[in-house]
Amino acid sequence: MYLDAAEKQEIFGKYGKSNSDTGSTEAQIALFSYRISHLTEHMKLNRKDYSTERALTMLVAKRRRLLNYLKDKDITRYRSIVKELGLRK
């Protein structure tokens, strides 16, 4: 698998409150961003993989919903996570 438990713990430790903080919005957004970048690379090689294309679209939408939630709740945390991850907005 492209993402093992140690890599997940590293992502959660960097963007969450602790290594076991899997529920914070920032940690979830960071994990989705990692998965989106991996699937984007896969789609560059396999253009006709429509199930992966659908999964990628769903992940982007889920990340967008989390970003909208964070923007409504705490704009400073939203701006910091967008800047750290290098997202467009």
From Swiss-Prot:
A GO biological process held by the record: translation
Assembly and oligomerization: Part of the 30S ribosomal subunit. Forms a bridge to the 50S subunit in the 70S ribosome, contacting the 23S rRNA.
Gene3D superfamilies cross-referenced by the UniProt entry: 6.10.250.3130, S15/NS1, RNA-binding
Family: Belongs to the universal ribosomal protein uS15 family.
UniProt KW Ribonucleoprotein keyword: yes
Pfam families the record matches: Ribosomal_S15
Transmembrane helix is among the record's keywords: no
Domain of life: Bacteria
Species, as recorded: Bacteroides thetaiotaomicron (strain ATCC 29148 / DSM 2079 / JCM 5827 / CCUG 10774 / NCTC 10582 / VPI-5482 / E50)
Gene: rpsO
InterPro entries: Ribosomal_uS15, Ribosomal_uS15_bac-type, uS15_NS1_RNA-bd_sf
CDD domains on file: Ribosomal_S15p_S13e
Protein name: Small ribosomal subunit protein uS15
Any one GO MF annotation of this record: structural constituent of ribosome
GO CC, one annotated term: cytosolic small ribosomal subunit
Species lineage: Bacteria, Pseudomonadati, Bacteroidota, Bacteroidia, Bacteroidales
Function of the protein: One of the primary rRNA binding proteins, it binds directly to 16S rRNA where it helps nucleate assembly of the platform of the 30S subunit by binding and bridging several RNA helices of the 16S rRNA. Forms an intersubunit bridge (bridge B4) with the 23S rRNA of the 50S subunit in the ribosome.
Keywords assigned by UniProt, alphabetized: Ribonucleoprotein, Ribosomal protein, RNA-binding, rRNA-binding
HAMAP family given in the database record: Ribosomal_uS15_B
